[in-house]
Amino acid sequence: MSLLKTILNRRQKGKPFVHRDGRELSLHFSEPVVQSNMNLDQPDVLALGYTRTMMGFLLFVPEPKKISMIGLGGGSLPKYCYRQLPDSKISVAEINPDVVALRNEFLIPEDDGRFRIHCEDGARFIKNFCASEDVIVVDGYDIAGHAPSLCTEKFYADCYRALSRQGVMVVN
């Protein structure tokens, strides 16, 4: 199916969709803007530049024990952290169950003792932590852009409270 036909079909349904072009998979949210990209031959490689930039947190926290992420998308960042940081416990909040449902297509790991996806609002999710997170990664978008609940002063205060003493937060 052509990308245009897929977009028009999904736009009517209002759901995220996956487009395959050869060995590349991309995630879209009812428009032609790529939200995530994965090469099937190298599924753990961070294909988009912004994801490599966000991993700059390793300069400040080279061995994080606890990482909380808001926004799953195609799972590039959580998957990379899971594979490359074997001593890290990773929790991901994704508000959209239709995005979570695509996890197998993007080869995102199953939940286990050190990796878990929570289908909930990231702003509510982050309230569960207190001075415990070494890294908070915020990459939460909806069809219109940044999710409104992730743009409030209260959200940023909750993130600050959730960080460990040496913790860092990165925001796309």
Label the model's feature ranges:
Residues 1-64, 83:
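Rossmann-like AdoMet
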Residues 9, 45-46, 51-168:
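The AdoMet/dcAdoMet-binding core of the Class I SAM-like
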